[in-house]
Structure formats: C-alpha cells, structure tokens
Amino acid sequence: MSVAACAPSGDGNAGRHKAAPPIRFDSIGIASTEGDCANADSACARVNILYPLAESETHHVAADAIHQTVAEWLLGRPGDDTRSASPDTVAAQFIAAFLDFRRANPTRTPRWTLTRAVRVVVDTLGVVTLHGVQEDYEGGAHGMTNTFWASFALATGKRVDVNDLVAPADTGRFRAIVEREFRKRRVFPASVSLADSGFFAETGGRFALPANMGITRHGLTLHYNPYEVAAYAAGPTSLTLPWPTVQDLLRPDGPAAAFAK
C-alpha cells in the first residue's frame, strides 16, 4: 500500500496584503509497506519518504538549486552513481527488492526499512538551509545512515560553500578552527596524527572540510558521514561552530554574516 500527501507549509489563509515568501515549500510524503508489519516476528518492509517541494515566482535559480539537491539526496546514495527516476520509484524498487528476497528466502522473516527525510530548518535572512537523512536497513550486521546539510543564498541562488563564507585568505584559519573542534569531538590531542588514528587516510592524514555544511541560527553545522573520512566503525562526526567562534572570519557580504550579528 502506498500513500502520498501534499500539504503547503505556508498559511493558505494569510491575508491578501501579506507579502509572499521568496520561496514557497510544499511538504510531500510517501509511505509504503509490504508484509505483516504489525507483527514483530513477521517479514515486513517499510518505506517513509518526506521532502519539501520548492516553488518561487521571483527566485527561480535558488528554487531550482534546492530542487536538485533534494533530488540528489532522495534518489541516490553516497558513492553510488546510479539514481532512481523519482521518489515513487525509490519506494517501488525497495519493495520489489524485498519481494525478490522473500521469494528467494521463503523461510526467513526479514525486516527492511528505508527512510528519506528532508526538512527546511532555516528560511530567513536570505538563506534556506536543508537537513536530510537517509536510513537503510536490508538485513545484515548493520544498516546505513547518512546525514546531509546544505544552505542556499537567495541573492545568488547557489548552494553555499566555504568560499562564500570566508575570504580565500582566511580559509586556512577557518580550516584550523574546524580541525580543532573536530579533534575535541573525537578526543584527539593536537599531537596525535589523524592518519594514525584512522582518519583522513585518503588525504594522507591532512584535515579536510566536509561537503555537508549548514547555516543555522546558532552556528555553522558541519557533518562527516560514515566512510567519508574513516571506517564505518568510527561512525559519523557532527559539530556546530557557534557564530562567535568564526565571526571575525566571515565575509561581511556573505550569506552567514547576518546570522553572526
């Protein structure tokens, strides 16, 4: 059984004199189950997908960039170049794979789950920030969870990267601050090699910034997913830099400047 729902995130009864938001978000939900999911001892597959659909009459470039990023998170997986055609296809393919497994293993009672959830966590001061989660379990020793962050500047329409946040001359100082916080989170003293600790092997132990960065009201959130900079057993690493920590490095005309005031 599959259920899809669409509900606008804004106030549909707002007064006609109220200015329309730069980007309007509708929440789309897809839920699908297969098997006897009410019985914990029975085979079951569950799919839950929730994401925002961005629309705008004035900020088309930003809305398109947001749409592309949401699609990337919903339809693919990190390290896998294949991509499903649509969220409905993601659900259908997962259920089909579950049924194939059941036919090949009729005596087993697998419990499979797939979750794709994307939320708008910031929509103010000319910035939209998305937070996304992928969770997959298809049996085995463990499932897989990936977390995503991305911010978009409405003024340019582009996804924000480190060069939008700090000037090139300050990138080294910014990276040093992030590394310091990373080491605190991982309890690695400055004297300990990251490579010897099992991190950043692909860069020879040299610290690197993550692809996932998000502007929030409280600070800049950065996230490293499993396998991104270490083995799966090391788990993910997430940290938030309070704005006072990096305020002196921020571009005064950049998308994060207004949040740090």
Model-based region annotation:
Residues 3-5:
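C-terminal motif of bacterial Sec signal peptides marking the signal peptidase cleavage site
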Residues 7-261:
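Compositionally biased intrinsically disordered regions enriched in Thr/Gly
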